Amino acid sequence: MATIPGSPTSPNATHPLQGDELEPGLLYAVLTYRGELASWNWTFFVPNPAVTPIGSSGTSFHVVDNAVGGWKFEMEVKDVVSSPHVVAIVRLANVSFLGDYEDIVGTDSLLPMFQSVAIPPAGSAGVTDFSSRTWFLDAIYVLHDCCVVQCDDVWMLEREIRRCAFTAMDKYLQNSGASEPPSDLSLDLISCRRLDGIPI
């Protein structure tokens, strides 16, 4: 099992991100605040290494709900390191073997994998239980089957990511007593990273 150079060596643990930027060639999970302490939007993110600090621009892959009760897949450029709504950033895998940044986020790499994850049509029975979290977890299965992410237990990964988010929110609330994240949350306060290559 390979680990990323400079990563802590303790398996099955999350560790604070070092510095104020992400690492190139990695796939991250990003949770953003939705206005409730235990409710987050779940997103995949690949940072663009050409823009510094790394993480201030990159491609996010996620689903969003629309006004008519349906869901749709979106791919968009985002800044996660300075976003006031980011609660947790968790490293999932080194995806540099897929090529450079444009290759990784392009039409022949991660994009078709994410697009293959089923989204229930508006008005169907499955739409009531569907969320960005359930889509994210289904996408982890696809990424695992395609040998992009090594994850033997998706539910354990979900618990670990949620733990990071709860820890970040608790730490923030203890420090300020406010009911929502401030606009200047620092990356080392709110973020955790996971060793890649560790079966979960």
Map each language-model feature to its residues.
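Non-catalytic ligand/cofactor/substrate-binding and regulatory segments of enzyme domains
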Residues: 2-130
